[in-house]
Amino acid sequence: MRLWPAIAISLPRVTPPEGCEIDGSWVPGGTKVGVSQWSAYRSERNFARADQFLPERWLPEGEEESFINDTRAAFQPFSTGPRNCLGMNFARAETRIIFARLLLDFDLELLTGRDEWEAQKVYIIWDRCPLYVRGFGRQTRHKRPANLWLPWDTHGSSASNERKLADLLS
């Protein structure tokens, strides 16, 4: 989501009526402004080795020295403020479950090079090219918790919050 944000355009905001200063430049009131997520996420001002996929950059602060000065607040894939994405919490929960299932059950191998991804067309959203991945089933099963507590009550009873993890992920 950092290297290839879902939205390719900037998410607009309007400056206050009295105007304001943005990054050292005066902007008159009522002006539509925006920051490209792609530019912010690829900027060395915000992230060390910004063009590289390095998941260790997200480890808790202090664990990876080379990323200690990263501006993590610049990473806002769902926008920010009162008009941010309504589906943000659902998308994060869904992504965690899907990735957990994939990583527990498969060893993955990327089959295409990065060149195709660098040449993607963009309009308002990305015209994505396929990402070809080969999955190898794992021989050993990881021990999973028996139950998963969901943070919502679907039908008014607390019992409905408990779901078998195997059922949820199958």
From Swiss-Prot:
Heme binds at C85. Pathway: Secondary metabolite biosynthesis. Its cofactor is heme. The keyword Iron applies. Keywords: Heme, Iron, Metal-binding, Monooxygenase, Oxidoreductase. Its EC number is 1.-.-.-. InterPro entries: Cyt_P450, Cyt_P450_CS, Cyt_P450_E_grp-I, Cyt_P450_sf, Cytochrome_P450_monoxygenase. Pfam families: p450 (PF00067). It is an enzyme of class 1 (oxidoreductase). It comes from the Eukaryota. One of its GO terms (molecular function) is iron ion binding. The keyword 4Fe-4S does not apply. Cytochrome P450 monooxygenase; part of the gene cluster that mediates the biosynthesis of oryzines, natural products with an unusual maleidride backbone. The two subunits of the fungal fatty acid synthase oryfasA and oryfasB probably form octenoic acid. This fatty acid is most likely activated by the acyl-CoA ligase oryP to give octenyl-CoA before the citrate synthase-like protein oryE catalyzes condensation with oxaloacetate to form tricarboxylic acid. Belongs to the cytochrome P450 family. This is Cytochrome P450 monooxygenase oryQ.
